[in-house]
Amino acid sequence: MVKIECDIPNSSQRAELLKHTSLIIWDEITMMNKHNLQAVDSVLRKIKQTDVPFGGIIFVGAGDFRQIPPIVRNGTREEIILSSIKFSPLWRSFQILDLIIPVRQQHDKEFAELVDKISNGTLETNEDGKVILELIKTTTDSDEWTRFVYPDIPHVDPSTKAKALLTLFNKEVDKQNENICDVLTGEYKTLYSHDELNESSDISEFFKDNITTEFFNQINFPNVPPHELKLKVGMECYIVRNLSPEEGILNNTQVKVIHTLKNLLHLRHLENGKIFFIPRITFSMVLKRKGIKLNRKQFPIRAGYVKTFNRSQGATLDRTGPDLRTECFCHGQLAVAISRVRTREDVLILTTQDKLDVYNRAITTNVVYAELLL
C-alpha cells in the first residue's frame, strides 16, 4: 500500500500559517494522485487538531476528470483509474459544482461541441474504432507545422508566449526543440551537470566501485534537465521546479535567457518582465529496476518551444500544433491537446498520410476511461 507523508512540524512557520488558513484552492487537482491529497488531509488534521476533512479548512479543487489523470509509471488502466482522487475515501466529502459554459471556446460553438465529444468519448468512431477529427486543419509537413505556430522562424527568434507545439513523448520534445533552437540566432553555450550516486542506492559494493560518471551522464528523466544543457541568449525556456512562489518563479513559468554564467542563469520572466537569477539545484532520480539513486545538480530549465501534452494541461494558448503521428494511449490526452486554443483556426494537427481520410481529416485514437468521468 502506498503511503505519502507530509511532514510539517507543528512549531514551524508553515504550520502557523496553515493554522490561520480558512481557504485552500488546488488547481488541476484531477491530475493529482489520491495519495498526495490524503497526505495533505492528514497533515491539516494534525495541525488543526481536529479529525474532520482537511482540518475543517474550506478546500476547493479545480479540474476536469475528462483530461489527463495522475501519472502511474508503467501502470495498467486499473492502476491509473484507482490512483485518481475520485477513488479516495475523501471523495465523499466533496460537493461537485459543474461548470457547464465552455469559456475557452465560447466564440466557436462547433469547435466547443467537438471538444466536448472528444472529452466525453462520444465522438463517433469508424469501423476501426478511430475518431475522425472534423473542423481541424491537418498537415503532413513538419516545417509547415512549425511555421504555423512560429511563423517568423528563421528570420526572427520566435516567442513562446501563449504558443506551443505539442507531442506525446519527452524524446520527441527534445528532438523538436533542438530543431528549432538550431536555427535561432547566436551560439550555443553548453552547461554541464554534476552527477553522482546517492549513497542510499540499493546496489552492491562492486557495482558502486565500478559505476562510471559517463553512465550517469547518459541518463535522462522526465522533467529533469539533461547532463548537457545547451542554451542560447534569447532562447525561451520554462522552469521545471517551484523556485520562488513569492516572486512567481514556479514550475512551467516561461522565461527568456539573458545571460549565462558558470553558476547562475540570468533570465527574464515572460509574463511580468522581471529579471532574475537562478542557481543550479539538485534533482533526485531513481532507476527502480537497478536500485540506483542518482543526484544531478543542474539548472532547472528546459527549452520551451515544444512541450508534452501533459505539460500543456491547464494552459490557454493562442496557437498550437498537436503531433498525432503517434496516437494517444491514455485517457484525456487527445482532449487536452485539441482544447488548448479558443477556435478551430488556432490549431494545426501534424499527422501522416496513412492517418488521413479522403477529405484530409485526421484519423486517430481517442482514449477515454468511463470510470473517471463524472
Where are these regions (language model features)?
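RecA-like helicase/translocase P-loop NTPase motor core
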Residues: 1-374
